[in-house]
Each structure stands twice: as C-alpha cells, then as structure tokens.
Amino acid sequence: MQRISALGLDLGHRRIGVAGCDGTGLIATGLTTIRRTSFTKDMEILRQIVVDRQVKTLVVGLPYTMKGEVGTQAQKTQKLAKRIAKALDLPLDFIDERLTSHEAESMMREQRINPAEQKGMIDRKAAALILQRWLDQKPWLSST
C-alpha cells in the first residue's frame, strides 16, 4: 500500500492551523497552530514539519463564498498558499473549507472546551477537517 503524507493548512491572518495524516491516509489529525510573525519564520516552522513528517503534498482550505464563488478572501488565500508551496517545494491542492471553523467550534463545545479561549485549537481542528475532506475524496483509498 502506498504511504500517504499530506499536510493540511488553515491559513489565517494571525495563525496557521496545521494538520497531518497517518501513513494510510485515512485519518487527519491537528498537529499545531503557528502564530504568524513573518513569512520567513513561518516557513522555518513549516519546513521542519515537512521534513519531520516527510510531507509530499500540501492541502490548503479555500474559503469560497457561500455561493461557491472565489471571493476576495479566497484570492488572498490562493496567493499565500502558492507562495508557501513554492517555498516548501511541494505540490499544492485546494479544498473547499466553507464552515470548517464553525464545525471545529461545534466539536469543541461538545467537548466542553470554550472556543473563545482556544483560538489556536480552532485553527488546528479546522486544518484537520480540511485535510480529512481531501483524504476522503482520494480515489486510491476507495479501491481497498
């Protein structure tokens, strides 16, 4: 069986939620949240994660509008994601991230965690949801 190594990112203005998957590509898990400081420092952190996890693909959530259109925020996300993918020398795939942050907050409330006090956890969980959506769409997994 082919080993899957993808990194999911939830890109925000202040933070980047990061998620990884198990080698089978079945389960995505939140790894960390990077508090953005500068592009260079952010890339140092991401590069280390990529090396440690032997990442082969970058998956970024794209915030489409509720009508399914690429709006201003999605354009900004695409631009930053392409810059990150180039810096990390990784192929890039986008996935619809609509409502992932809301879904992450709901999950936290179910676990009796106050989302307002754990913004980094929201980003990390949203990144895991983004990566899980991508993994669930991959054809190599359904042929087992």
From Swiss-Prot:
Q: What is this protein's function?
A: Could be a nuclease involved in processing of the 5'-end of pre-16S rRNA.
> CDD domains attached here?
YqgF
Q: Which GO terms describe its biological process?
A: rRNA 5'-end processing
Catalytic activity, EC: 3.1.-.-
Similarity-based family? Belongs to the YqgF nuclease family.
Q: Which UniProt keywords apply?
A: Cytoplasm, Hydrolase, Nuclease, Ribosome biogenesis
Entry-linked SUPFAM superfamilies: Ribonuclease H-like
**Lineage top rank: taxon:** Bacteria
Query: Quick check: keyword Hydrolase in the entry?
Result: yes
What EC class does the entry list? hydrolase
| Subcellular location as annotated | Cytoplasm
Gene Ontology molecular functions: nuclease activity
Which is an annotated Pfam family here? Answer: RuvX
The root-end lineage is:
Bacteria, Bacillati, Cyanobacteriota, Cyanophyceae, Acaryochloridales
Protein name stated in the entry: Putative pre-16S rRNA nuclease
